[in-house]
């Protein structure tokens, strides 16, 4: 249910911000235009926000600066400690994409680099849950690595192997990265209109509105 990869972030918490800022050559393309991605998610969000996978709080900061009320959902203890120290007044809950509480009305669910922790069947379940919580016009704004097709995914894995970027390739094979057609079906099945915008070679912005 998304928690099987939580321990990976115990090792990554110390260097995560260095990775997203482009200091790790292997992940530089994954996090290209990182600040622009965070801003795009923030700009498309409405009202009260639930953020999945707060990490070290980079998207949280953008959302708070934009005036949103934010509830953070984070399954990793080390990451929660970092975010809690950075934002002492933030409501921060131990939870994940499928197992969470919302103590207030929610108008937007957001996440960056998180949705791939769920299998495709779990993604459908999650979207159905969000639809049951959101009002008509409520939004899901996710940014994550997505591929146009399974063939494109395999080609990217081969490219990373050829470049010697085996950590990236292993990640693409280990976790549940999916395709735009699969996600389009899942969003529409849950009652959302969805649009996709490519942000870099890996990441697409998903902007979904409940019908």
Where are the model-predicted features located?
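Conserved class I S-adenosyl-L-methionine
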Residues: 1-44
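Short catalytic micro-motifs in class I SAM-dependent methyltransferases
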Residues: 113-117
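Class I SAM-dependent methyltransferase SAM/SAH-binding core
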Residues: 52, 56-99
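A conserved beta-strand element that flanks and buttresses the S-adenosyl-L-methionine
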Residues: 110
């Amino acid at each position: 249910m998304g928690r099987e990869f939580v321990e990976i972030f115990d090792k990554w918490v110390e260097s995560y911000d260095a990775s997203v800022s482009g200091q790790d050559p292997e992940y530089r393309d994954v996090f290209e235009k990182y600040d622009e991605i965070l801003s795009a998610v923030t700009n498309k969000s409405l009202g009260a926000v639930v953020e999945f996978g707060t990490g070290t709080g980079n998207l949280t900061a953008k959302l708070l600066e934009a005036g949103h009320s934010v509830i953070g959902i984070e399954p990793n203890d080390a990451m929660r400690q970092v975010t809690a120290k950075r934002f002492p007044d933030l409501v921060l809950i131990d939870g994940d994409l499928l197992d969470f509480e919302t103590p207030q009305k929610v108008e937007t669910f957001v996440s960056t680099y998180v949705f791939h922790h769920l299998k495709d069947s779990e993604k459908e379940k999650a979207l159905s849950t969000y639809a049951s919580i959101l009002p008509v016009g409520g939004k899901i704004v996710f940014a994550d690595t997505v591929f146009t097709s399974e063939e494109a995914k395999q080609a990217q894995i081969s490219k990373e192997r050829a470049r010697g970027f085996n950590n990236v390739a292993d990640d693409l094979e280990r976790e549940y990265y999916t395709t735009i057609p699969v996600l389009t079906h899942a969003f529409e099945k849950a009652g959302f209109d969805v649009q996709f915008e490519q942000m870099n070679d890996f990441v697409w912005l998903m902007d979904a509105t409940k019908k």
